[in-house]
Amino acid sequence: MENQKKKKIIKYTKCFKVYEKELTWDLFIKYLNDNMEFCFYLNNITIDIAFHYKNKTKVYELNISSGENKTNLIFNSVDELISFKAFNNKSFYDIWDELEN
């Protein structure tokens, strides 16, 4: 039996109606570039992705928490964020199929 990938479903509200859509890797990258924020779970780890402006420049935040341990990282671009090996020497791309939302 072939291994099936877990689908990540994103829910959002538009004009008071709730929509659901599969969150593919390409859509995830698009939404990050469009200033959407995310929260994922990986085993017992919470992964929050956010953005803010620092001196008029957009920066991306990666906040990782597991119990009392918390890590907060700042990146200058989506490419830097998704390629950084923050998860046991793996990047977001490497762990994409393991993430749950």
Show where each model-derived region lies.
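Amphipathic, interaction-prone secondary-structure segments
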Residues: 29-65
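Mixed-charge, Lys/Arg-enriched low-complexity segments
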Residues: 4-13, 70-101
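Short linear motifs embedded in intrinsically disordered, proline/glycine-rich low-complexity segments
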Residues: 1-5, 60-66, 101
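Short linear sequence elements within intrinsically disordered, low-complexity coil regions
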Residues: 21, 45-46, 65, 80, ...
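A short, sequence-level motif marking secondary-structure junctions
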Residues: 20-23, 50-58, 78-82
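Negatively charged, low-complexity tracts enriched in Asp/Glu with abundant Ser/Thr
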Residues: 2-41
